[in-house]
């Protein structure tokens, strides 16, 4: 009898064997319902064979086959199989992650009826001026008069569901549902919107990509902020859609704005589907199916849209390719950018990686000849670059982390009826210990790196060599007792600014204040209306948002990036600074950027200010080569957590011994730790980690694979929660 090897969404790196009943035929990639323990579960057939490691009479039969054909396309299936192996993650978890929720639940892989809004007869004739007191209702009814609006697309528009419900209450709009009809956009395809005239650099980029349209090619589109990268994407898509092929456009979580989506919808007379967190399960399945059967011409989405099946994919675009949100930080820790390149190679199509501040790994791949670079160096509209200033904080009396000079400049810009942005980049920065009076930083005597401050354990610790020392009472350089951790949080800053600027509306935009659905849009709308004059934010604010009245931008905790134990923090700061500089001074207003630091002479600041991001990247790549850090080497991070701060370090020490005893290990394998994680305690659990480094990615993969096969033999393995992160981007 045939045996189905079934992947289930459980944290075990294996498949489970079931007998296929007489007459039941399934293929790899089809869903089945199987008995598992005392219940039935949905599984995915990974393979079918005639044998099992267990006696056949001990196997249970498959209860039901749910699909005649695989739910995955051939290329996505190959991608997922490879990714499960590369990231050492359970195959069942990987396969289920790539499916819409309704398919995970066993629902049919077919379209369900969708709801849409339409204008009633009264709504078609009523005077729109009667709604002028409610701008959103007026906008909504005007849009409905142009045609029906699918309910799942309301979040992409300038009005909201509440406005439509209000119109419904007045008898001007109504809801109905219908099964989406299979439509072919290709016969009526045209470019609907206005084309902008491409400059020479843009035209060269479009031509180069078009010349390689029939094979794999990876292009870095490096363009300064405001240089017109989106127009290049649109022109490339124009060529792809004209051939009847489809396009996948990936954007960071925060970049999926109504304005971005509108640009694509207005340009093409072809269906654009958007995959984002605001969709309900049936809407997400509908968009997924439209891509699979070829109905969707363009899919725009965040990280997980990478796994969408397409009937005939012609190009992949990854906007802001350096953005850290492309790396999944929970569960299966994959990097969508890296997997997208793998997929493009498998599909034999071009991929475009766009950024004003390319990741060092991407620039390294250009140097290695794996990618080709296209550069856009001219800013659209000849906007003037912002004026840049560095404020030395040493010995200055600070209020809420702000120097007197910065507070004075803020007052001047606010009095001119402009807006001010204050940036904090706390995410991923490890705190260092700094003397406020002379600028001394606690430095490890054995390494060329800075101690990380661990307040809870009352000590300084080096995350490179693991040496530690007590927190000093006074500065060894000047004797001052004014020793402070570098950095301040957005919440404390908001509270401290209120008494300094009592009449000025303040808006804080970070993950805490925008976690509720629609909250980010509400904050941004308030900013555009002029309702908030001071904006406090993290990197979320730096990405692509156009604030015409912002003329002053300040980065407050620069030292946190310059002296972090995380070797990537300088790169992240350089990217943030470059993006932020583009936020100040648009719409004909002169912008100003102010950096606050205790170390104005720092080489990184000097390079960034006077030579720009490209020069910084050259310098940073050279430094990483000297220190043998990625991209010159490969990393795997293994983190363990416990409740008592004892089992996790013990487990990791046992694991370290196992790794170093591996017959595959050689003198080039470098292991750091166990050391406390940069955030040593979260949710009541203590976190420890070890970092593995090797110049050969393939060799490191073999070492890790061999060790993981033995990990459950370790005495502490079942007493801790542990995770493995291949190519980690955060320490």
From Swiss-Prot:
Pfam families: DEAD (PF00270), Helicase_C (PF00271), PriA-like_WH (PF21213), PriA_3primeBD (PF17764), PriA_C (PF18074), Zn_ribbon_PriA (PF18319). Residues 486-626 are annotated as: Helicase lobe 2, C-terminus. SMART domains: DEXDc, HELICc. A motif (DEAH box) lies at residues 319-322. Residues 387-430 are annotated as: Helicase lobe 2, N-terminus. Residues 115-177 are annotated as: WH. The keyword Cytoplasm does not apply. A motif (Aromatic-rich loop (ARL)) lies at residues 326-340. Residues 1-98 are annotated as: 3'BD. GO terms for biological process: DNA recombination; DNA replication initiation; DNA replication, synthesis of primer; double-strand break repair. Its EC number is 5.6.2.4. Keywords: ATP-binding, DNA replication, DNA-binding, Helicase, Hydrolase, Isomerase, Metal-binding, Nucleotide-binding, Primosome, Zinc. Initiates the restart of stalled replication forks, which reloads the replicative helicase on sites other than the origin of replication. Recognizes and binds to abandoned replication forks and remodels them to uncover a helicase loading site. Promotes assembly of the primosome at these replication forks. Belongs to the helicase family. PriA subfamily. Has an N-terminal DNA-binding domain (residues 1-177) with 2 subdomains and a C-terminal helicase domain (residues 200-731) with 4 subdomains. The 3' DNA-binding domain (3'BD), bilobed helicase core, Cys-rich region (CRR), and C-terminal domain (CTD) interact with one another to form a shallow cup. The circularly permuted winged helix domain (WH) projects away from the cup and is quite mobile. Nucleotide (ADP) binds between the 2 helicase lobes, while the surface-localized CRR binds 2 zinc ions. The aromatic-rich loop (ARL) probably directly binds DNA. This is Replication restart protein PriA. The gene is priA.
């Amino acid at each position: 009898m045939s045996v189905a090897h079934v992947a289930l969404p459980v944290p075990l790196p294996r498949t489970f064997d079931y007998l296929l009943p007489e007459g039941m035929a399934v293929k790899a990639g089809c869903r089945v319902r199987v008995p598992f323990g005392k219940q039935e579960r949905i599984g995915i057939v990974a393979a079918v064979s005639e044998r099992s490691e267990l006696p056949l009479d001990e196997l249970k039969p498959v209860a039901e086959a749910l699909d005649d054909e695989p739910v995955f396309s051939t290329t996505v299936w190959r991608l997922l199989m490879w990714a499960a192996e590369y990231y050492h993650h359970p195959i069942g978890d990987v396969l289920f992650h790539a499916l819409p929720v309704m398919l995970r639940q066993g629902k049919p892989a077919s379209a369900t009826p969708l709801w849409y809004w339409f204008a009633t007869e009264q709504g078609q004739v009523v005077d729109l001026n009667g709604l002028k007191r409610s701008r959103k209702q007026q906008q909504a009814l005007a849009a409905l008069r142009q045609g029906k609006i699918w309910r799942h697309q309301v979040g992409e528009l300038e009005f909201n569901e509440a406005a439509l419900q209000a119109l419904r209450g007045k008898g001007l709009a109504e809801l109905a549902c219908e099964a989406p009809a299979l439509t072919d956009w290709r016969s009526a395809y045209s470019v609907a919107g206005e084309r902008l005239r491409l400059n020479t650099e843009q035209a060269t980029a479009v031509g180069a990509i078009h010349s390689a349209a029939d094979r794999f090619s990876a292009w870095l589109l490096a363009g300064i902020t405001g240089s017109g990268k989106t127009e290049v994407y649109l022109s490339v898509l124009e060529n792809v859609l004209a051939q009847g092929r489809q396009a996948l456009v990936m954007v960071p979580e925060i970049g999926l704005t109504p304005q971005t989506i509108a640009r694509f919808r207005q340009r093409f007379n072809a269906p654009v589907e958007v995959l984002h967190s605001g969709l309900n399960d049936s809407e997400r399945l509908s968009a997924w199916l439209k891509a699979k059967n070829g109905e969707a011409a363009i899919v725009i989405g965040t990280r997980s849209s990478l796994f969408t099946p397409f009937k005939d994919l012609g190009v992949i675009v990854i906007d802001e390719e350096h953005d850290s949100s492309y790396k999944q930080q929970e569960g299966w820790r994959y990097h969508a950018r890296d997997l997208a390149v793998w997929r493009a190679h498998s599909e034999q199509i071009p991929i475009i990686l766009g950024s004003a501040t390319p990741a060092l790994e991407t620039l390294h791949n250009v140097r290695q000849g794996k990618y080709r670079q296209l550069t856009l160096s001219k800013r659209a509209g000849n906007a003037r670059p912002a004026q840049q200033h560095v404020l030395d904080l040493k010995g200055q009396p600070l209020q809420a982390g702000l120097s007197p000079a910065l507070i004075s400049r803020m007052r001047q810009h606010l009095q001119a009826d402009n807006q001010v942005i204050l940036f904090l980049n706390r995410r991923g920065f490890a705190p260092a210990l700094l003397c406020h009076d002379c600028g001394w930083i606690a430095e490890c005597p054995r390494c060329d790196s800075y101690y990380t401050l661990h307040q809870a354990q009352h000590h300084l610790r080096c995350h490179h060599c693991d040496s530690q020392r007590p927190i000093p009472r006074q500065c060894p350089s000047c004797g001052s007792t004014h020793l402070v951790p570098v950095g301040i949080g957005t919440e404390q800053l908001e509270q401290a600014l209120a008494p300094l600027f009592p009449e000025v509306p303040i808006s804080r935009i970070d993950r805490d204040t925008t976690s509720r659905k629609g909250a980010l849009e509400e904050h941004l709308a308030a900013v555009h209306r002029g309702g908030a004059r001071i904006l406090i934010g993290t990197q979320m604010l730096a990405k692509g948002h156009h604030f015409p009245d912002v003329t002053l931008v300040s980065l407050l905790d620069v030292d946190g990036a310059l002296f972090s134990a995380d070797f990537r923090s300088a790169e992240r700061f350089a990217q943030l600074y470059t993006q932020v500089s583009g936020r100040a001074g648009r719409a004909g207003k002169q912008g100003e950027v102010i950096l606050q630091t205790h170390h104005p002479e720092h080489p990184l600041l000097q390079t960034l200010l006077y030579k720009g991001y490209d020069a910084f990247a050259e310098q940073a790549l050279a430094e990483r080569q000297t220190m043998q850090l990625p991209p010159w080497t490969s990393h795997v991070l293994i983190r363990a957590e416990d409740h008592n701060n004892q089992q996790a370090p013990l487990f990791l020490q046992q694991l370290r011994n196992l790794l170093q005893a591996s017959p595959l290990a050689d003198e080039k394998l470098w292991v750091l730790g166990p050391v406390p994680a940069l955030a040593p305690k979260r949710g009541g659990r203590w976190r420890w980690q070890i970092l593995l480094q090797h110049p050969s990615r393939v060799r490191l993969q073999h070492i890790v694979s061999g060790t993981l096969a033995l990990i459950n033999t370790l005495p502490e393995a079942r007493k801790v929660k542990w995770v493995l992160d291949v190519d980690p981007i955060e320490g």
